[in-house]
């Protein structure tokens, strides 16, 4: 179970960010036309508390959020959360923190691009295949997609991380969207530079040229039916280190609970994914590549020592 010190750390970071975010929002509010008085009564629980509870859920052994909220947050951790909503009210309020949660991840806890990045996608199954035609929550939203283990129904999470194992960016799409999709790659590689290592599913001359123009050099392996070509030694070494992004996906699924089939609304499904990625950013151990690098000021060329 997560310690009190860790919960306090997450809450303090989230609370400081939410206060700054509210100040920025207050500067951008449009003036009222009717000059009518508005109520500004605060909720019993702040956005920071909701974000903290959602993130801490992925640190515990509870496999059901309702049990976690009722028997952990409102009982065991009552000293940390003295004023809490009922479970039904908490579920209603949760989607209202979507903007704050997304901004918190993007601006406060996600990592930065260092010039060495890894990209991959993982499947997010939301329902068993045999229940596809009786699906209600994700009707007309979830689609069929194919993975190495066969067909599944749900979505696809595209992730970008650096060599430290820190998530840089993400994109959630339907299951039948190609990894090389132009919109997906443009969103993922925004503010990314340097080398981008990917698997053979990202082989595309069009994608290579488009990223090259943005200052990103995508490096992939070669298929068996492709003509062999020379590749720098450090690129070959870094392609073998792609297990970093695979380990990130594994921790999101097995340590956190980014995949399960108990969703009752689309909003809470998205909040669960955001909370899982937020929890991963606070994990004490992350997969990483053991090497040292520097960029000499003389020529600006990236130098790697394995």
Please report, for each region that a protein language model flagged, where it lies by residue.
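Short alpha-helical elements
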Residues: 1-306
């Amino acid at each position: 179970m997560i310690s009190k010190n860790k919960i306090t750390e997450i809450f303090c970071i989230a609370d400081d960010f939410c206060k700054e975010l509210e100040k920025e929002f207050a500067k951008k509010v449009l003036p009222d036309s009717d000059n009518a008085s508005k109520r500004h009564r605060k909720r019993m629980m702040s956005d920071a508390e909701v974000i903290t509870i959602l993130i801490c859920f992925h640190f515990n052994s509870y496999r059901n959020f309702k049990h976690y909220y009722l028997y952990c947050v409102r009982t065991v951790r009552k000293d940390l959360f003295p004023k809490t909503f009922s479970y039904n009210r908490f579920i209603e309020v949760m989607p209202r923190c979507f903007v704050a949660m997304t901004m918190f991840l993007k601006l406060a806890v996600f990592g930065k691009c260092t010039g060495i990045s890894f990209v991959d996608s993982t499947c997010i199954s939301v329902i068993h295949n045999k229940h596809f035609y009786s699906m209600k929550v994700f009707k007309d939203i979830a689609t069929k997609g194919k993975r190495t283990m066969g067909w599944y129904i749900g979505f696809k999470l595209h992730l970008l991380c650096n060599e430290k194992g820190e998530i840089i960016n993400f994109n959630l799409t339907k299951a039948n969207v190609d990894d090389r999709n132009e919109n997906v790659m443009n969103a993922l590689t925004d503010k990314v530079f340097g080398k981008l290592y990917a698997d053979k599913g990202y082989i595309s001359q069009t994608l290579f040229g488009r990223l090259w123009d943005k200052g990103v050099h995508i490096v992939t392996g070669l298929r068996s039916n492709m003509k062999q070509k020379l590749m720098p030694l450090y690129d070959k070494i870094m392609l073998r280190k792609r297990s970093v992004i695979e380990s990130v996906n594994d921790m999101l699924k097995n340590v956190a609970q980014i995949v399960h089939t108990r969703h009752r609304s689309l909003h809470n499904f998205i909040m669960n994914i955001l909370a899982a990625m937020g929890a991963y950013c606070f994990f004490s151990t992350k997969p990483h590549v053991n090497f040292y690098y520097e960029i000499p000021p003389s020529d600006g060329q990236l130098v790697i020592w394995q």
